[in-house]
Amino acid sequence: MEMFTFLLTCIFLPLLRGHSLFTCEPITVPRCMKMAYNMTFFPNLMGHYDQSIAAVEMEHFLPLANLECSPNIETFLCKAFVPTCIEQIHVVPPCRKLCEKVYSDCKKLIDTFGIRWPEELECDRLQYCDETVPVTFDPHTEFLGPQKKTEQVQRDIGFWCPRHLKTSGGQGYKFLGIDQCAPPCPNMYFKSDELEFAKSFIGTVSIFCLCATLFTFLTFLIDVRRFRYPERPIIYYSVCYSIVSLMYFIGFLLGDSTACNKADEKLELGDTVVLGSQNKACTVLFMLLYFFTMAGTVWWVILTITWFLAAGRKWSCEAIEQKAVWFHAVAWGTPGFLTVMLLAMNKVEGDNISGVCFVGLYDLDASRYFVLLPLCLCVFVGLSLLLAGIISLNHVRQVIQHDGRNQEKLKKFMIRIGVFSGLYLVPLVTLLGCYVYEQVNRITWEITWVSDHCRQYHIPCPYQAKAKARPELALFMIKYLMTLIVGISAVFWVGSKKTCTEWAGFFKRNRKRDPISESRRVLQESCEFFLKHNSKVKHKKKHYKPSSHKLKVISKSMGTSTGATANHGTSAVAITSHDYLGQETLTEIQTSPETSMREVKADGASTPRLREQDCGEPASPAASISRLSGEQVDGKGQAGSVSESARSEGRISPKSDITDTGLAQSNNLQVPSSSEPSSLKGSTSLLVHPVSGVRKEQGGGCHSDT
C-alpha cells in the first residue's frame, strides 16, 4: 500500500508544477479576483496547470468580455479558466445552462472575431448543476426575449484593430482612434491597378511642373536685375514649388519603400503605413514637402502685398526692397514653425499613393488645422489684397485716360496680374475644395472600409444606417494635380518676348567668337558690300555729273576691352548719290546700340580731320574705284574743280595720285588707327555723311550739305 502511494506521488508531482498536492490556492488572475469566490484549483478543464497560462489563454475571449455580449460572460470565463475550489478538493465547473446562455448571446461576435471555442467548453459536455451557484440574468433580456439579443449584437461597437495591423508599443501609431494600430499598405481604398495609374500620373505631372518652375528660376539667374520688387516674390514662389515637384518625383521613384513599413512574418505583421517621425527618410520627405508647400503659399501672399504697396500705396521699388528682410522672415519662419510643431506632435504620415510623406492623410484634426486652415487664411488675405490693388490700378487708369500710351501699358499690366492670379487661385481653390470634401466624407469612407473587410480581418462589423460610400480615384488625382500645377502660373509671368531674347542672347554669348576678330569681320564685310555695289553701278551709269550728291560712309570698328585697351581705326568709303541705299542696306550699316553719343555730336568737327587722313593716306578700294570712275566720265579738265570742291570742304585732294594710289592699293584694305580708344564689345559703327558737290560755272566752288 505504501509502495502504491509512492508511485502515485511520483507520477502526479511533475504535473503539479509547484502547486500543493490537491489543495486550493488563492486566485491571482486580476480579471477574476472580483468574483464571489477567491480560491481556485488547477489543472482546470483545458489542462492548464498554472494561473499565468490560464490568464494568457483567456485573453482570446477578452473581446467578448469587453463588449459585454452577455451579462454572464465574465462569470462563465472565470469559472471555466479559474474554477471554483470549495473545501479543499471540491471543484465546481461551469454549469451547462450558463454555457448555453452565454454562447447564444455571443455567437455572432464569436464568428465575427474568429474565436475558436474550446472543445472542453462545449455546452454538451458540461453537466447540469444545482442552484447552489447562482446564475445572474438580465431581467430586460428575459422580458424582451430575442429582440433584445439582436439589439445588443447590432449596436455600434467601434473599430477593433486587426492583428496584422497592430504595431509595437512606443511608436505613437494611431489609426481610426485605436492606439498601436496602423493603416494597411497598399492603399486601403483602391486596387493595385488603380494605384499604378495614379502613381504614373503623379510622376508625369511632377516632371512637367519641375521643368516649368526651373525655367522660371533660370530665367531669373540670366538677368537678376530684371525681376525687382514687387515682382521678386514670383521667383521665390517658383523655387518653392520646384522643390515640391521634386519631392513628388522622388516619391514616384521610391514607390512604397519610404511611405510603408515592410511586413514581419515572425511577428505576424503585415505591410502598414509609416506613422510618426521614427522613419528618417519619411521624415525628411515630409519636412521638405510641407515646408516648401506652405512657403510657396506665403510667398504668393507676399507678392499680393508688394503689388498692393506699389499700386495702392504708391510705394517705390526701393521702398519695398527695404522691407525684404521682413518678407523673408515671414515667408520662411512661418512654415518652419509649423513644421517643427508637427514633428514635435509626431504627425508625420506616409502617403501610399504618391510615395511621399505628408500630414493629415489619416488624421482629420491635423489636416484641418495644419493644412486646410493655413491655406484658407492665405487665400483670403491674398485675394483681398489683390482686389484692392486691382481697384487702385483701375482708378489710376481712369486718371490717365488722356495718355493713350501709358493707359495701354497699364491695361496690359492689369491683364497680366489678372491672368496670373487666376492661374494660381483656380487650382488652389480647387485644392481647398478637395480637402473640404475629404473632411466631410472621410468617416463614411472609413466605416465602409471596415464593413467591407471586417469578416476578412475577424473584427466586429459596424452597425450603421447610412449608405456605404467609397472615394473616387479621380478626387485624389485632382488633389495631386492641383497641388503641383499651382507652380506653373509663374511661367506665365516670365513668358514674354523679352525672356526669349534673353535666352537667345545667353546661348549666343556661349558660342561667341573673339570680339576683336568679330569686329574686323563685320568691317570687312561692310567694305566688300560697298565695293561690289559700286562696281555694278559703274557698268550701268555712263554719264556722271559732278554736281551729283555723294555719301561719305565712315566705318569705325570698336574693339572689346579684354584687360588691355584695343584701338581700331576708321576707313572712309565714298558712294555716289545715285546708289540709293535700301532698307536692308541701311540695316546692315546701322550703328550698334552701344555707339558712343560723343562721336555723333562731334561729327561735324571730326569729318574734316578724317577727310584729311583719307587724302593723306592710301585710299580704300571702294573710294579709289569711285573716284576713278568719276574722272573717266568728266575728263581731266574737271579734276581741278573736284580739288577745289575738296578744299572748300576742308580737305586736300591729290591730283594725280588718286588713280595710281587707288589702283596700287586696291587689294590692301588699310584701317588707320583712331586716336580715341574704344572699349565697346565687338561693335561696328558706320557713320554716313551726305556730301553734295554743286558745281558753279563761274567760281567752280562746292556747296556741301552735311
From Swiss-Prot:
InterPro entries: Frizzled/SFRP, Frizzled/Smoothened_7TM, Frizzled_dom, Frizzled_dom_sf, FZ6_CRD, FZD6_7TM, GPCR_2-like_7TM. Gene3D superfamilies: Frizzled cysteine-rich domain (1.10.2000.10), Rhodopsin 7-helix transmembrane proteins (1.20.1070.10). Residues 646-658, 694-706 have a biased composition (Basic and acidic residues). Residues 223-233, 306-324, 392-416, 495-706 are cytoplasmic. Residues 588-706 are annotated as: Disordered. It is linked to Nail disorder, non-syndromic congenital, 1: An autosomal recessive nail disorder characterized by a variable degree of onychauxis (thick nails), hyponychia, and onycholysis of all nails, with claw-shaped fingernails in some individuals. No other anomalies of ectodermal tissues, including hair, teeth, sweat glands, or skin, are noted, and individuals with dysplastic nails have normal hearing and normal psychomotor development. CDD domains: 7tmF_FZD6, CRD_FZ6. PROSITE patterns: FZ (PS50038), G_PROTEIN_RECEP_F2_4 (PS50261). It is found in: Membrane; Cell membrane; Cell surface; Apical cell membrane. It comes from the Eukaryota. It comes from Homo sapiens. Residues 1-18 form the signal peptide. Residues 19-132 form the FZ domain. SUPFAM superfamilies: Frizzled cysteine-rich domain. This is Frizzled-6. It is a multi-pass membrane protein. The keyword Hydrolase does not apply.
